[in-house]
């Protein structure tokens, strides 16, 4: 099942349920991460951006934006990975994970 740990602002579930092909997934304030990826600092930063997005948008707001963006890209001929990488919430999380910058604040 895996270890569930409380951290400031989120719960981390190492060994929790993660979709096939993914290293981690965040639902609300719970970050589920594969054991092999638990030490990946960039991945954790990425997932913590999702925690902030869930908090900012709420459950329905996050899911609506995420799923509609994914569906739009799929409907426009992109495969799963390409559509996923174009979801604005994923783009934001990846940018902040790589740069440490939150350009929305400026």
Stretches found by the model and what they are:
Residues 1-26, 35, 58-106:
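Metalloprotease/metallohydrolase-associated module, dominated by Zn2+-dependent proteases
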Residues 37-53:
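Short alpha-helix carrying the canonical HExxH Zn2+-binding catalytic motif
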């Amino acid at each position: 099942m895996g270890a569930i740990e409380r951290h400031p602002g989120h719960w981390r579930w190492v060994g929790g349920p993660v979709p096939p092909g993914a290293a981690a997934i965040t639902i609300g304030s719970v970050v589920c991460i594969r054991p092999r990826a638990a030490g990946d600092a960039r991945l954790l930063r990425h997932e913590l951006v999702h925690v902030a997005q869930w908090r900012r948008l709420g459950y329905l707001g996050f899911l609506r934006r995420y799923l509609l963006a994914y569906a739009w890209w799929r409907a426009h001929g992109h495969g799963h990975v390409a559509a996923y990488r174009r979801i604005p919430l994923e783009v934001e999380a990846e940018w902040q994970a790589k740069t440490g910058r939150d350009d929305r604040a400026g």
